[in-house]
Design a protein with these regions (language model features):
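Short, Lys/Arg-enriched N-terminal segments with co-localized hydrophobic residues
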Residues: 1-8
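C-terminal peripheral helix-coil segments that are non-catalytic and often amphipathic
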Residues: 2, 163-196
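N-terminal positioning helix adjacent to the helix-turn-helix/winged-helix DNA-binding module
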Residues: 10, 16-24, 145
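An amphipathic alpha-helix adjacent to DNA-recognition modules
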Residues: 18-26, 30, 35-36, 44-47, ...
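Residues within the helices of the helix-turn-helix
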Residues: 40
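Secondary-structure edge/capping motif, primarily at the C-terminal ends of alpha-helices
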Residues: 78-82, 104-109, 133-137, 164-168, ...
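Helical hydrophobic small-molecule/effector-binding pocket
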Residues: 84-132
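Amphipathic alpha-helical packing segments from all-alpha helical-bundle domains
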Residues: 113-140, 144-159, 189
Length: 196
């Protein structure tokens, strides 16, 4: 059984290193332009060597792509979670948006001034909605309190998405921007009702 424990430790260490690499990259991208960041910069910031970096990513573009995809999946999951049960045309917007972002180079997405704010809000909303899933069956009264915050965060995220779409697509997707803004406004009303 010793080899099994060894594999588990190795896996945990690998996960921690991967998180350190991502954190280092996100810190660096706020300090300098993404095109000026090197693998040596990331390795230094994450306190690893270049060989260790290459065990986790083939290149900076590979790292950016995986981080972007991860964010898109989280975004899709948490938005659909907080939309229950009143789902209208919103899934179509999410489908288009996630498809568009999936096909857009990660560097372009991360260079948007709205990206970091979205990351923060989606991460917190994702954790809140997961916690709500686990706890509501034990404490039904917790749902309003937890989902108030989650819906508030998603409302802010939708405003950021609408702004990002306006910034990147210059009027080509005006209808989608309008839908996002309407959904954000609706979520704000939901929050107000839950707070009454």
């Amino acid at each position: 059984m010793g080899w099994c424990r060894g594999l588990k430790v190795q896996y945990i260490n690998g996960q921690e290193t991967e998180e350190n690499i991502k954190t280092a990259f996100l810190e660096l991208i706020q300090e300098k332009d993404i095109d000026d960041i090197t693998i040596s910069d990331i390795a230094r910031k994450a306190c690893i060597d270049r060989t260790t970096f290459y065990r986790h990513s083939l290149s900076i573009d590979d790292l950016v792509t995986s981080m972007t995809q991860e964010m898109i999946y989280e975004m899709q999951s948490v938005i659909m979670q907080t939309r229950k049960p009143a789902i209208t045309a919103f899934p179509n917007v999410v489908w288009w948006l996630t498809t568009e972002l999936s096909e857009t180079p990660g560097r372009e997405i991360m260079q948007s001034k709205y990206w970091y704010k979205m990351c923060e809000m989606i991460e917190e909303a994702y954790l809140l909605s997961c916690s709500a899933d686990k706890r509501i069956w034990k404490h039904p009264d917790m749902e309003p309190r937890m989902m108030v915050r989650a819906r508030y965060l998603i409302g802010g995220t939708l405003y950021s998405l609408a702004a990002m779409l306006s910034e990147r697509f210059q009027g080509d997707e005006e209808d989608l921007v309008i839908v996002l803004m309407e959904e954000a406004t609706r979520l704000e009303r939901d929050v107000q009702k839950l707070c009454e």
